[in-house]
Amino acid sequence: MQAPDALRRPFTDPEWLYEIKYDGYRCLARIEGGKVQLLSKALKDFTRGYPDVVDGLARLDGGPHLLDGELCVLDRLGVSDFNTFHALRANRIGRRSPPVTYCAFDLLVFDGQDVMHQPLEVRKTLLQLVLLDAGLIVAEPPEDPPRFPHNVLFVDDLPAHADVFRVMVQAGLPIEGVVAKRRASTYHPGVRSADWVKIKRPGWQEGRVWRS
């Protein structure tokens, strides 16, 4: 998986797009013919642990597709809750556990074709189309806390990075930050690339990192 570099100061540049940084568990999702496989950074299979996410991704037509994203627990504002997700993975939450959502932000293989060499903007457009065709994108989630269709969320880019980031910080939303990505960048698996830059919210403390 490609990983972002860290940068503290926000910046605005039309050649970059900006996404909310979801705080959870990085996950590749392979889908083909209704069958889904979920893989960790180290390519360990943990498909059985997230049946609702698997059922949602199984709605994707065609394949094989390979998605990159983050498994998260989302609160009533749609903000990822790392501590709750960690407790869920550690089996410290009972039967009424919160739903896990797959936050998809990139597409690496589309209908069997490697698209990692395509610009990020193209890959995100293809990802959005694939999820739309499967009925996995809605304008507004209908529940509180929001439950996205079949536990899958398309991570769209923010329309105005500097303003949105400032508003989120001033509102006190508990987000880790944003990830800035160069629009024309290709995907480099296993590389910490300067084309992806993590901008942390001031005062944010890093959560625990799993290595699986």
Locate each region found by the language model.
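Catalytic cores of nucleic-acid ligases and guanylyltransferases
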Residues: 1-212
